[in-house]
Amino acid sequence: MKKTTLLILIAALAATPFSASAAAKKKSRPRRPQTVGPAINENKATPISRIKAAPGFKVELVYSVPGSNQGSWVNLGLDDKGRIIASDQFGGLYRFPLPAPGKKLDPKLVKKMPVNIRAVNGILWAFDALYVAVNDYERKIDSGVYRITDSTGDGELDKVEKLRAMQASGDHGVHALLLSPDKKSIHLITGNNTEPTASQKSRVPRAWGEDHLLTRMPDGRGHNRGRLGPAGIIYKMSPDGKQWEIISSGYRNIFDGGFNRDGELFTYDADMEYDFNTPWYRPTRVNHVTSGSMYGWRNGTGKRPEFYPDTLPATINIGPGSPTGVTFGYGAKFPAKYQNALYILDWSWGKVYAVHLKPEGSSYTATKEEFIIGSPFPVTDAIIHPKDGAMYVSIGGRRVQSGLYRVTYTGKESTTPAKHQPNRSKLVSLRKKLEKFHSPNAQAIKQAWPHLTHSDRFVRWAARTAVMHQPIKQWSGKALKEKDHGKRVEALLALSKMGGIDPSHRKDSDAPVDTGLARKIVNSLLQVDWNKLQTEQQLTLIRAYQICFNRFDRPGRSNVEKIVQHLDPHFPAQTFELNWLLCETLAYLQSPSVAYKGMQLIKNAPTQEEQMEYARSLRFVKQGWSTSLRREYFEWFFKAANYRGGASFSKFIEFIRNDAVASLSRTDQVKLKDILDKKPVRKSPLEMLAEAMAGRSYIKEWKLDELSKIAATGMKNRSYANGRKMFGAVGCFACHRFANEGGMTGPDLTGSSGRYNTHDLLDQIVNPSKEINEQFVPIEVITLDGRKATGIVVNLNGDSVTVNTDMFDPNQRESFDRKSLKSLEPSKVSPMPEGLLNMLKKEEILDLLAYVLSAGEANNAMFAKKK
């Protein structure tokens, strides 16, 4: 029976266009057409038949950009007369009047601006001038910030001034310019390949550091090796370009941003697609840019996960993509909900998202909605025109066919301008009060210290940042002797950063670090009672140890033993986050028990990310191994060789193994020679899934109505641990992102409880083809000469269309010349097979449902036990 069931499951998977996972629906999501029709062969922008908008909205193609003459447009802006300005990524600026309602743009009205400027990524009219941010790949002019003015008074811009040259390279360079809310200054957004420029002030404390306890592994393909923080910086500059201040840092590649009506800045940051399915992968995400914030980008494996106390969490994680333009809907003749939305553009997936922000504490949470989708639809920028209230969207970039589209509302809801309700919550006021101390100030310690244990993370960040800006002599003693252990760990984390020097940033001219201070910090941390700390404070305690070790040095032997005694009893913990930091720290300290405990975690971890993280930490451990335990560790690499991930995934696995082999003694290398010489057997995704299901027998063919009835009364006293285990057992983690773990080839299921009730979620699982998430609908590509491929369009470059043909493996791609395409047709069959629940028992299904609907929160009421 078991073998037969697995064969049935494999057959079901093989029958799908390619392996992927369950579709999640959204009531307001625009629907893709059932038939896409002929491919684009002529040199015209994507036709409207390939583009769909949210209900009630209309999209019009107003202009197909002649690429040979006007290039490929990446940025839009307005001048003081309301004329639209567009920039060619590798050329100049073009200006034209607003097209008449319902009419296309007359090509004769598109004029190249007669100014010596090119490669503009940011456009802003302010202070009677046109400011532009230049990011010139070809280095024909300096990248940086320029001001263009009318020197003769004839109404034509003719004078170009370079306000600041900046060193930048590739896509991740100098980007958007935004008028500050007070209309007295300008914010500049830069990517992580822009070298930091001189600044008189910084809201972010200038204690730059990588802060890796274990040796960082660089990207396996060499991307950004050697690039250190700070990176991805947002600056504020004066109109004359002379005064500069760092506002925030730690972004990968933010292209644009927008201020809401309360003056809060939001941006949309890029993921690192090479990191797919690794523990350090971070999806594209919307971030709230607060004073002194740091969002944790570092190269290679060094990216800080959201749970680290020395970074901040995203407002909302979006998923894989390529962020471009950002704008709020203010001034649009849209319903109020859409006037207040933050619009973010995803170039690679061809989407405009409407992000609906909701104040929470001193920051925000959000939900996302697919507002416009198209294929191909490489969106680059969007603006709201104040004269007609329409949204104008450009496509282009990387020399692909460019176009300009108009989006209007034609539905029945009111488009009366939405009334602004200022966010005057006490927590916002408190955060902003603390942010005023993000510079030296005699009152800062007194004002900030009480809030180091505030329950609101952004308030806590603002308080700690205020402390870090003050001379450490004013507060080091207070930190070391603080009686409140929650405040102590926050203060000592700050003291470790400000009192030590990160070795990657240490200069020859730097004075030696104060080892006496390091001993005091360690001794103070040793006195902290673990059991009196909340989970977040426990994470801060461990991280404070890590930063202290990194910025000062490894503690002496006697202190190492004391620290191990302090932390080891709490490992393993109840959460992946705590286990991540505990395993890493105890491995660094060469705890005698970490090898055994870490291997138990690897065996029981349901995701490849979690397994990979523990394996990464154990690679340098030399103590506590038996020969059999060593074998068990190296046998894991045979399993890992068949895991799928981004372009650097296999290299990361190789790096971990190489380090582990190098950590072996000569004697151990001889003992383990057979397993070290053994080569992994490559297996298909179907074989891997069959192995995961091995040992399970067919239970029954579960029906929707039956399961719905059981779930109606069975969602209490569930098991979080078993639910997570089942999520891995039936292959969900292989395709789905969930609570910052899992694959990227199916919809992110973290927010399922906001989209589904229990019955609807079961319906999606039992009947996966009933409604397929458009983002993951496989497309069949047919060329003029009859060649076929099935997959998802993942990249465009010039006339090249790239398709991912194996959704279990992001690296399986095939490229086509778009001029050679005959058709693109969507499949009506979900990549997710039916019957995945048929090998689970009733209680296992209920635990699985509870896990999904809990958004991965172990303290959800569904997991509360009867007293």
Model-predicted regions and their roles:
Residues A382, L404, G723, F727-A739, ...:
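The canonical Cys-X-X-Cys-His
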Residues V62, L130, S697-K709, V766, ...:
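C-terminal capping alpha-helices of c-type cytochrome domains
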Residues V379-I383, D388, G397, E609-A615, ...:
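C-terminal structured "cap/appendage" subdomains that terminate the fold
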